[in-house]
Amino acid sequence: METISTAAYDRGWQSQWDDMKKYGPFSRHLRRIIQQIIRPLEFQSVLDVGCGQGSLMQELQAEFPRITPYGIDLSASAVELARERVSGGCFRVMDITKGSLDEKYDLVVCSEVLEHLPDDMTALQNLRKMTGKYLLISAPQGRMREFERQYGHVRNYAAGELTDKIERSGFAVESVVEWGFPFYSPLYRDFLEVTGSKGTTGEFGAVRKLISNAIYYLFLLNSSRRGDEIFVLAQPVASS
């Protein structure tokens, strides 16, 4: 079981992942599906756990201009970028496995984080402390590829595992979306397993942006009922 060091994670945000998060087809679909799931909900304060450089919060602000944005991330470099890019936001460096903020937020989003954490149950318990109304989690499930291990994945969830852990952490699951079959997973993930993932990182020039955009539109043909990317919307259960 490999984990990525804090220093390596910070270096990734300094030089490797910014354009991938902005222009990469998978990251764009993550944001699209998150927005689709939360659109019917009522919320004002939003906490993005694992906020990175703020790309999700930028899009949420554009669609929901009245929200109050907050974010935490392990990387000081990512947090600095988020502070520069998200107007009116409050962003802090924090390890979700070691603590929580004192406040509660209407909506807590934790996207593509738990698969990196050896102690995901402690992270979920800390998320519970900060969730006022809704928690939305996205994570991979199914077979783990080698390039995902290189990105610091310590697990991909088995069927039913993530929802079970969420419920054991004091939440009631409201809805589940499974997405990605067949073009994202298995086809795109298997392609990256064979070719390596270097082409997805670093600066995106005009050609890479064009290719990424084409793949984004191909991914629109993926099933929203079947796939290895899972989105779970949950609400905290009142303490008895």
Language-model features: where?
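A short glycine-rich, Lys/Arg-flanked "PGG" loop and its adjoining helix->strand segment in the class I
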Residues: 121-135
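Residues lining the SAM
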Residues: 111-114, 138
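A SAM-dependent methyltransferase catalytic signature shared across enzymes that methylate proteins
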Residues: 163-179
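Short aromatic-enriched loop/helix-cap "lid" or pocket-rim segments at secondary-structure transitions
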Residues: 147-150, 185-191
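A generic structural signal for alpha->beta connector loops
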Residues: 66, 88, 132, 170-173
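Short, glycine-/aromatic-enriched active-site segment of Class I SAM-dependent methyltransferases
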Residues: 135-155, 159-161
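Di-metal (Zn2+ and/or Mg2+/Mn2+) metal-binding site signature of metallo-dependent hydrolases
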Residues: 116, 120
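Conserved N-terminal segment of class I S-adenosyl-L-methionine
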Residues: 1-107, 111, 121-124, 156-160, ...
